[in-house]
């Protein structure tokens, strides 16, 4: 049985004010998450917090009762917020407090977790540091890239990481080495409550002409094969071993498949798009339908790459496809 929690941000804010009155960041009750995610759909965040800086975030976490659930979101490019909203506190780092790109060595940067990937690529271009061009084609922020080991054009975030800096749910600081991140394909194995705040990244010497050419190639490829002007969350599913997700989706007849306002893109069928008025229910139901059809056709069990968070709207629950249960 699924329990549904009433979203009442005003009441939660009033409850927390006595202990959190000293924060400098912004607290917004009942935040419409449609304004945050690239799908432009989904429910409310009960209390939405944007910390002013790392000190502010640590103070907030240290004084937030442990009974209050915390959800971390980034730029929202690969995020689906369910229609029933997100109980508790949603934390999103702002570019103002966590968007620095500081060159700290001839080929190294200290980068805030709220930095847009494309801005990191641009900074590396100006500094003539190679190895960051692939970020020009990733529509997200560094925090999400660190979490998911984001990559493109054969390069992954793990190839650039030296150290990652994080706060845990209690507001304690942690420094993680590359080995501590335990990276694998689109995954890192660190505690779920860690909030990445920054990372030390290392590239290699380069020249502006070659770097710009590599970035242009990334942009041209992305424009030619991905529905970049649609309301989408990027790649819907991780690639199975030894084959592309789009190929098994296409072979199963799911290119263009539609449920409500949600559709698997005709241009790139591993991209799910909101054609106009899709609900989160439509999008998740479409994804699970694709998973079932692909498994029935080819026995490939697709795993979601898009992050799905929050609670379902009462009476509109999407069951996760499980062929073994």
Curated annotation (Swiss-Prot):
Pathway: Cell wall biogenesis; peptidoglycan biosynthesis. Its EC number is 1.3.1.98. It catalyses: UDP-N-acetyl-alpha-D-muramate + NADP(+) = UDP-N-acetyl-3-O-(1-carboxyvinyl)-alpha-D-glucosamine + NADPH + H(+). Its main location: cytoplasm. Transmembrane segments: none annotated. The active site is at 186, 235 (proton donor), 305. InterPro entries: FAD-bd_PCMH, FAD-bd_PCMH-like_sf, FAD-bd_PCMH_sub1, FAD-bd_PCMH_sub2, MurB, MurB_C, MurB_C_sf, Oxid_FAD_bind_N. It is found in: Cytoplasm. GO terms for cellular component: cytosol. PANTHER family: UDP-N-ACETYLENOLPYRUVOYLGLUCOSAMINE REDUCTASE. Cell wall formation. Belongs to the MurB family. This is UDP-N-acetylenolpyruvoylglucosamine reductase. The gene is murB.
């Amino acid at each position: 049985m699924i329990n549904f929690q009433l979203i009442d941000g005003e009441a939660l804010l009033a409850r927390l004010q006595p202990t959190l009155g000293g924060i400098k960041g912004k607290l917004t009750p009942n935040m419409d998450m449609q304004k945050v995610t690239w799908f432009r759909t989904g429910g409310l965040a009960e209390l939405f917090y944007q910390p002013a800086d790392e000190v502010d975030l640590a103070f907030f976490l240290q004084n937030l009762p442990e009974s209050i659930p915390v959800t971390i979101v980034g730029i929202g490019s690969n995020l689906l917020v369910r229609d029933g909203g997100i109980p508790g506190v949603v934390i999103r780092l702002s570019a103002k407090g966590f968007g620095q790109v500081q060159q700290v060595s001839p080929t190294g940067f200290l980068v805030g977790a709220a930095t847009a990937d494309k801005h990191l690529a641009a900074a590396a271009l100006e500094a003539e540091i190679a190895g960051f061009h692939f970020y020009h084609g990733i529509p997200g922020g560094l925090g999400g890239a660190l979490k998911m080991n984001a990559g493109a054009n054969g390069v992954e975030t793990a190839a650039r990481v030296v150290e990652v800096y994080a706060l845990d749910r209690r507001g304690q600081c942690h420094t993680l080495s590359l080995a501590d991140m335990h990276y694998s394909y689109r995954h890192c194995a660190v505690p779920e409550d860690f909030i990445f705040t920054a990372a030390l990244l290392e590239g290699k010497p380069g020249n502006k002409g070659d770097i710009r050419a590599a970035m242009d190639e990334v942009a041209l490829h992305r424009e030619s094969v991905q529905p970049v002007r649609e309301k989408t969350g990027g790649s819907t599913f991780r690639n199975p071993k030894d084959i592309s997700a789009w190929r098994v989706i296409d072979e199963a007849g799911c290119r263009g498949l539609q449920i409500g306002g949600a559709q698997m893109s005709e241009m790139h069928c591993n991209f799910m798009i909101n054609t106009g008025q899709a609900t989160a229910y439509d999008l998740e139901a479409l994804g699970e339908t694709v998973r079932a059809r692909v498994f029935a056709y080819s026995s490939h069990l697709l795993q979601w790459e898009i992050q799905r968070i929050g609670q379902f709207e009462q009476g509109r629950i999407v069951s996760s496809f499980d062929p073994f249960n």
